[in-house]
């Protein structure tokens, strides 16, 4: 498949699938959505309306420089070595306003808005924001090369993790 053959519906289906895999805690399949070189970044707000611009120079809410970091996170989730995730929260991701911003032969730039509901300790939390994806196009389909998550409500009562966004 080339990026020109990848339809808008293919991109939407890929994004929906990733969200479902998080909600279902299908960690192995979720990791398969990511290229080995994938960067996962959720920058902090420097002030009320400015995001930090470099994860190596500024504090980030989440930063993994490649898929190995995500694999390590999943290992800790599975082994219950993550006190911040025990018990595992129940999540539901809602995706909206998916746009393809740019296409090349090998990549697709997309953005979308999301809202995640999270239930844990008899409390309901809501997280919402905008995500920016660089998707790699290959004969085997789409994979995430870069995921930048802009969390719009960054007042966090408990923890924020990869399954929330």
Curated annotation (Swiss-Prot):
Its EC number is 1.14.12.13. Keywords: Aromatic hydrocarbons catabolism, Dioxygenase, NAD, Oxidoreductase, Plasmid. The keyword Oxidoreductase applies. GO terms for molecular function: 2-chlorobenzoate 1,2-dioxygenase activity. Pathway: Xenobiotic degradation; benzoate degradation via CoA ligation. It holds the Pfam family Ring_hydroxyl_B. GO terms for biological process: 3-phenylpropionate catabolic process; benzoate catabolic process via CoA ligation. It is an enzyme of class 1 (oxidoreductase). InterPro entries: Benzo_1-2-diOase_ssu, NTF2-like_dom_sf, Rng_hydr_dOase-bsu. It comes from the Bacteria. It catalyses: a 2-halobenzoate + NADH + O2 + H(+) = a halide anion + catechol + CO2 + NAD(+). Transmembrane segments: none annotated. The keyword Transport does not apply. PANTHER family: BLR3401 PROTEIN. NCBIfam families: benzo_1_2_benB (TIGR03232). Belongs to the bacterial ring-hydroxylating dioxygenase beta subunit family. Heterohexamer of 3 large (CbdA) subunits and 3 small (CbdB) subunits. The heterohexamer is part of 2-halobenzoate dioxygenase two component enzyme system. The other component is a NADH:acceptor reductase (CdbC). Component of 2-halobenzoate dioxygenase multicomponent enzyme system which catalyzes the incorporation of both atoms of molecular oxygen into 2-halobenzoate to form catechol. This is 2-halobenzoate 1,2-dioxygenase small subunit. It comes from Burkholderia cepacia (Pseudomonas cepacia).
């Amino acid at each position: 498949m080339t990026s020109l053959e990848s339809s808008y519906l293919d991109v939407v289906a890929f994004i929906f699938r990733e969200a479902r895999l998080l909600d279902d805690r299908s960690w192995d399949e979720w990791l398969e959505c990511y290229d080995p070189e994938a960067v996962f970044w959720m920058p902090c707000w420097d002030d009320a309306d400015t995001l930090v611009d470099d994860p190596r120079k500024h504090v980030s809410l989440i930063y993994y420089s490649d898929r190995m970091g995500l694999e390590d996170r999943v290992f800790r989730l599975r082994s219950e070595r993550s006190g911040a995730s025990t018990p595992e929260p129940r999540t539901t991701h809602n995706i909206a306003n998916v746009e393809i911003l740019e296409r090349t032969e090998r990549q697709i730039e997309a953005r979308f808005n999301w809202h995640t509901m999270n239930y844990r300790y008899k409390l309901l939390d809501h997280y919402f924001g905008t995500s920016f994806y660089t998707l790699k196009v290959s004969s085997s389909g789409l994979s995430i090369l870069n995921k930048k998550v802009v969390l719009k409500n960054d007042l966090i009562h408990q923890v924020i993790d990869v399954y929330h966004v």
